[in-house]
Amino acid sequence: VQFLSTAQLLLTTLVVKLAIIAVLSTMLVRFQQFRRILLTEQRAWRERLVFAFMLGIPLVGGVAARLLLNYNAADFLLAGPFLAGLLAGPYAGAIVGTLLGSPALIGGEVGAMPFAVGCGFAGGGIREVCPKEAIWHLSPLFFTDLHRHAWQVVSRFKVDWLLLLAAAPVGLELIRQGVGLRFGTNAIFFYQPDSLLMAALIALSTVLSVAIPIKIWNTARIEHRLQEQDTLLMEARVDALANQINPHFLFNTLTSISSLIRSQPETARTLILKLSTMLRRMLRTQEHF
């Protein structure tokens, strides 16, 4: 007995798909090494490989789940390589595309690997021409300002990177739909909409599959930068306080010690020991900050 219609089942699959990518992105950003890679835009080859495999290996499980269990919600054959290329360069995107396309190719989908690798190179190509910070501005709520960005393109004849970042996954999804309709599901897996509304929702879910991880990871980047700023601010405050207090404090203390050396040598010795202990403690505190 089928409790859901075809459209309802497809809509549920798309919602679960977005939940899966959100959970996976949150789990990955908890790893210190993965977070450290996100903080730098100029990455070495080793960091790109680590990023590609840390993102690609869990996504391979999603493709395998679709092939073995017929569970379509965990398939990110398009969004995964595109996201890797967008954040780590074309070769990282191609590596993720190869990882995700391999089980699909083994399962008989001959067009899966070329398409996935192409998505990786597409994301990497956009990264090469797009300002790096513009990538991090892509948000799951991009469509709320879409009309304003479209008007800027029309009125100023200037490239709007948000529109490009949102349009690229839509274009790739249309290519996948076209290839799937032409050659069938034996060539490549694709969601089959029964109306224009469902086709639009499929395209929207593809963009959100890219935008949600970027939003989650950008939040982690901002939190790390705020922590660094708080640490630097605390260091500056400690240094300013030490520079303000130490000269007067030392002058008064040394004056008192000099007057006690002849009359009360034991008291002067005690003051010197306390002063040295206090200065050592202040030095350790500054080194700690």
Q: What role is predicted for each listed range?
A:
Residues 74-80, 187-197:
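Non-cytosolic membrane-interface motifs at loop->transmembrane helix junctions
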Residues 9-19, 108-119, 191-204:
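Alpha-helical transmembrane segments of polytopic membrane proteins
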Residues 193-289:
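Two-component histidine phosphotransfer core
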Residues 24, 28-37, 126-137, 175-188, ...:
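Juxtamembrane or sensor-core-proximal signal-transducing alpha helices
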Residues 88-89:
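A short glycine-centered flexible hinge/capping loop motif at secondary-structure junctions
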Residues 76-80, 96-100, 282:
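"Short basic amphipathic alpha-helical interaction patches in structured regions
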Residues 2-82, 92-93, 97-194:
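Hydrophobic transmembrane alpha-helices
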